[in-house]
């Protein structure tokens, strides 16, 4: 189920963090440091919390930034973050891979996800076993703003290039969750519902959608 999958995905992120933490400890640094920049994925935050829990008896300085795609790349480029968590698909891969190369960073896959539609459990479409893009046309689309790099290729949601008559852009997951629960809008994501989103939410597969390759980027000068 989604809960089991979430734990599996979180463990993969934690393993990467563990390797980074060990590298700092081997170098004789008395305080472990880990900085992560990520798109707005709840499983990333839950994995980060797991890292904090596992290190609670150690000295550490941890940073978790949920931010735009361009800022993730810039943070990794400038060594402000050890890793950056984001996704690739057939639409954005060429452009983002070039941006990674320009930043001297490489993409490492964590898992593949089928695109899902997130809606309120009271949404008219909530009981459907599968949805199409045509089914979503009458409803408001929610997406995360991308700042000055508001290119379709940098969007956190698949199919961002498809026109929509009603769009709401937000910058935090809390607002997104409130909008989804209280209104008949939707967003597209990996389909992994975190604990904070389990209540009042439905996750429905989207037909004929590209695979989301979720992973992390790391500067080429860093070696886990």
Mark where each language-model region is.
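N-terminal winged-helix
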Residues: 22, 29-74, 223
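Secondary-structure junction motif
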Residues: 44-50, 93, 125, 129-162
